[in-house]
């Protein structure tokens, strides 16, 4: 929930130089940039907002202090969220000493907006290669980029200028990185301290995506690690500024493509909150969205478990997990019509009602799946090799969770109670019963146990949703209807949907942690700015810390326990 009026007044009393603002959607503290670090430190240490969630920038194109920067922080004791804002023309002080997660967020802002962070230890680009000359999220940067390089396609080369009058003819294109650019980027990221720098990725089965890791090795011990991101960067946040709210839904499918339904749901709920229409979304749609997201959560965890086990040599579990996962994929395909990129939710409901017989098929699955899960636990949980590879490996304390901005099963594996479904319930999560499993030691083994238990809790949630949906008539609405279509147009295609002026930070509990959306609306059909807070991005930022003084063999184990998806990391 947003920070209360009382909390904001206490901050104002302690820090009289700040301005505070409270509304239903966002609680904000405004401060001059010269006092930013002192303010962040006081809010963290004196008011308990220890968990770093996100930091980014809005380009307002104003003549002075063009960029509005914001920090999203969370108090795990009072369960309050707050935003700290400041303005700048081109530079800000770095907050990396307060939170390591800020270091990665600042690199992203430098990359996308050109903001210089004073005191940043190693300010390099986050997604683009280091010799790139532009900052794509600035408002004066065109959507298609600057087409300055002559790079004709094969057809244009063969037919020459005979194609010059056709719509597909383009003699110039945007610049793409050369091998020389990538070599420079690699050398700029890590300064060798030990014997040899080992490249892992960007295309390797163990990374489960196009992630590029650099290990500085002393024998088989890793002295330092760096991660080069951006191989799957597609400019999703830039695209969001040019798409209607409903049309942007298809891009959420393509971030964490393993759990597209959960991403759909998080975006839809964020826009509904900004519109103020949560109360008119049909109860049937809320239960359907919750049930489908929990099926997707199990689906995601099964993929994680199968590939995790395979990476450590347990082929049997990989085969068992994928057999059950295929059943869920068939259920999802039967209901939504797609297996991977689904786009099932709609602003105001869902795309279509459940087909006849869907609930019976789901009931059949959740009846037999718990037994399968129990059998897998017998195979893995006390297996000597599995325990040896996971116990006391990749240990994270509670303070690490706050410092690195970690969420999801990674945070809960260290005993931090942080689950958006419980803390800020959306859709039907406030109407169903389930427990939040917590670890004790914060190692890879605890993160494994937490995800196993999460699948059991997802079954509980699905059971309750199925029972509730069975009591509902097929004629009950699955899409909200506007009281005044002239002011608010709610349709399946989303055409004509206008969102009022305002801003919001709203998040959902994805299988990989908190998926947050900061939406800034100037009114109209399209958002002015969308900042996506992916759980995978921040969970990955702790990886270099966990790899210090570990063996190369631990690289796969620790990475798998964090469970990043590169589509969500790179966006």
UniProtKB/Swiss-Prot annotation:
The way it spans or sits in the membrane comes to: Peripheral membrane protein
Q: What is its main location?
A: membrane
The places in or outside the cell where this protein is found are: Cell inner membrane
Catalysed reaction(s) here are:
a quinone + NADH + 5 H(+)(in) = a quinol + NAD(+) + 4 H(+)(out)
User: Could you confirm whether the keyword Metal-binding appears in this record?
Assistant: no
The record describes the protein's role as:
NDH-1 shuttles electrons from NADH, via FMN and iron-sulfur (Fe-S) centers, to quinones in the respiratory chain. The immediate electron acceptor for the enzyme in this species is believed to be ubiquinone. Couples the redox reaction to proton translocation (for every two electrons transferred, four hydrogen ions are translocated across the cytoplasmic membrane), and thus conserves the redox energy in a proton gradient.
| PANTHER family named in the record | NADH DEHYDROGENASE [UBIQUINONE] IRON-SULFUR PROTEIN 2, MITOCHONDRIAL, NADH-UBIQUINONE OXIDOREDUCTASE 49 KDA SUBUNIT
Specify the protein name.
NADH-quinone oxidoreductase subunit C/D
Specify the taxonomic lineage.
Bacteria, Pseudomonadati, Aquificota, Aquificia, Aquificales
Gene name, per UniProt, is nuoC
């Amino acid at each position: 929930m947003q920070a209360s009026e009382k909390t904001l007044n206490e901050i104002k009393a302690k820090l009289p130089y700040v301005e505070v603002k409270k509304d239903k959607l966002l609680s904000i503290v405004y401060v001059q940039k010269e006092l930013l670090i002192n303010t962040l430190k006081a809010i963290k240490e004196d008011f308990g907002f220890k968990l770093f969630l996100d930091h980014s920038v809005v380009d307002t194109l104003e003549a002075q202090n063009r960029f509005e920067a914001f920090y999203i922080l969370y108090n795990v004791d009072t369960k309050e969220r707050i935003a700290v804002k400041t303005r700048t023309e081109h530079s800000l002080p770095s907050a990396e000493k307060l939170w390591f997660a800020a270091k990665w967020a600042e690199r992203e802002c430098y990359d996308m907006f050109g903001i210089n962070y004073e005191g940043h230890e190693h300010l390099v680009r986050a997604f683009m290669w280091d010799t790139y000359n532009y900052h794509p999220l600035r408002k004066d940067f065109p959507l298609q980029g600057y087409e300055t390089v002559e790079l004709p396609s094969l057809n244009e080369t063969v037919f020459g200028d005979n194609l010059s009058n056709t719509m597909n003819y383009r003699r110039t294109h945007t610049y793409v990185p050369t091998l020389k650019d990538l070599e420079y980027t690699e050398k700029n990221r890590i300064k060798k301290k030990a014997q040899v720098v080992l490249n892992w990725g960007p295309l390797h089965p163990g990374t489960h995506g196009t992630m590029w890791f650099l290990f500085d090795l002393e024998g088989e011990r890793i002295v330092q690690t760096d991660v080069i991101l951006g191989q799957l960067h597609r400019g999703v946040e830039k695209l969001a500024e040019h798409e209607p709210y409903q049309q942007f839904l298809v891009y959420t499918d393509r971030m964490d493509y393993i759990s597209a339904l959960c991403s759909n749901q998080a975006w839809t709920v964020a826009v509904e909150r900004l519109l103020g229409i949560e109360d008119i979304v049909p109860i049937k749609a809320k239960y359907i969205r919750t049930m489908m997201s929990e099926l997707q959560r199990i689906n995601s965890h099964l993929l994680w478990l199968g590939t995790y086990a395979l990476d450590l040599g347990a082929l049997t579990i990989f085969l068992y997990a994928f057999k059950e996962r295929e059943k869920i994929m068939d259920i999802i395909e039967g209901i939504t019509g797609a297996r991977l990129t689904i786009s099932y939710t709609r602003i105001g409901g869902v795309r279509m009602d459940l087909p006849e017989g869907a609930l019976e098929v789901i009931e059949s699955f959740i009846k037999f799946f718990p037994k399968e899960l129990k059998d897998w636990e017998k195979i893995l949980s006390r297996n000597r090799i599995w325990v040896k590879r996971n116990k006391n490996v990749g240990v994270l304390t509670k303070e690490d969770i706050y410092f690195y901005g970690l969420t999801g099963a990674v945070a809960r594996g260290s005993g931090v109670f942080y689950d958006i479904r419980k803390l800020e319930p959306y859709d039907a999560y406030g109407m169903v019963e389930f427990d939040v499993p917590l670890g004790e030691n914060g190692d890879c083994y605890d993160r494994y146990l937490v995800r196993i238990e999460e699948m059991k809790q997802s079954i509980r949630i699905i059971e309750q949703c199925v029972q509730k949906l069975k009591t509902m008539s097929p004629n009950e609405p699955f899409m909200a209807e506007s009281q005044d279509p002239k002011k608010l147009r709610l349709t399946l295609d989303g055409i004509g949907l206008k969102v009022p002026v305002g801003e919001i930070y709203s998040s959902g509990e994805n299988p990989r942690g908190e998926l947050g959306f900061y939406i800034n609306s100037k009114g109209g059909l399209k958002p002015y700015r969308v900042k996506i807070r992916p759980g995978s991005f921040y969970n990955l930022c702790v990886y270099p810390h966990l790899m210090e003084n570990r063996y190369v063999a631990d690289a796969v184990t620790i990475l798998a326990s964090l469970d990043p998806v590169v589509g969500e990391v790179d966006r």
